[in-house]
Amino acid sequence: MLNPSRYRILAIGKTRKAWIQNGLNLYIKRLPGLTITELKDSDLKKEAQSIRSSIKTNELLIILTEEGESLTSLGFANRLKSLGSSRLLFVIGSANGLDSEIKAMANWSISLSPLTFPHEIARLLLIEQLYRAKNICEGGSYHRN
C-alpha cells in the first residue's frame, strides 16, 4: 500500500488560480500526510540552491520534466509500489524548468505528458496521479481500465 505521508511535493512559485488551489485541496484531503511546499521563483541557479537545501538526506529526488520517463497510470502506481517505504520528494520547476544540476541529482525523472502545461496545472496533475496510484494499489474503484 502507498503511504502519502512519505511523499512531499516541492514546487517553484505560488499557486495563483483559485480553481487549481481548490483541486489541490481536494486531493490533499484524500492523501493525508502529503505536503506541498512552494519555493520562491527566481533564476534557475537560485531555484536550484533552494531545492538542494530542501532535500532531506533520506529522500529520493523525483523531478517532473519533459525529458522524463513517460508512464501509464498503472505503470506509475507499480513504480511507486516498488519503491516500498522510501521517502519521495517530487520537484516541479518553474516556467523556466529545472537547473541541469538538479536534473543530474534526480533519482528518477518523469514526464506527465508530451504536452506542455502551466506549472500550476502540473501540480494538480501530479497530485491526482498520486491519489490514483494509491487507489490502484488498494484495489479501489477510482481508476478504470
From Swiss-Prot:
Q: Spell out the Pfam families in the cross-references.
A: SPOUT_MTase
* First-tier enzyme category under EC: transferase
Under Gene Ontology molecular function, one entry of this record is: rRNA (pseudouridine-N3-)-methyltransferase activity
Q: What's the EC number here?
A: 2.1.1.177
Which subcellular locations apply to this protein? Cytoplasm
Keyword check for Cytoplasm, yes or no: yes
This enzyme catalyses: pseudouridine(1915) in 23S rRNA + S-adenosyl-L-methionine = N(3)-methylpseudouridine(1915) in 23S rRNA + S-adenosyl-L-homocysteine + H(+)
Residues annotated as binding S-adenosyl-L-methionine: L64, G93, L112, S113, P114, L115, T116, F117
Q: Which domain of life is it from?
A: Bacteria
User: What UniProt keywords apply to this chain's record, in alphabetical order?
Assistant: Cytoplasm, Methyltransferase, rRNA processing, S-adenosyl-L-methionine, Transferase
Q: Does the record's keyword annotation contain rRNA processing?
A: yes
User: What cellular component terms from Gene Ontology apply here?
Assistant: cytoplasm
Q: Which family does it belong to?
A: Belongs to the RNA methyltransferase RlmH family.
How is this protein organized at the quaternary level? Answer: Homodimer.
Described function: Specifically methylates the pseudouridine at position 1915 (m3Psi1915) in 23S rRNA.
* Protein name as catalogued: Ribosomal RNA large subunit methyltransferase H
Q: Which organism is it from?
A: Prochlorococcus marinus (strain MIT 9211)
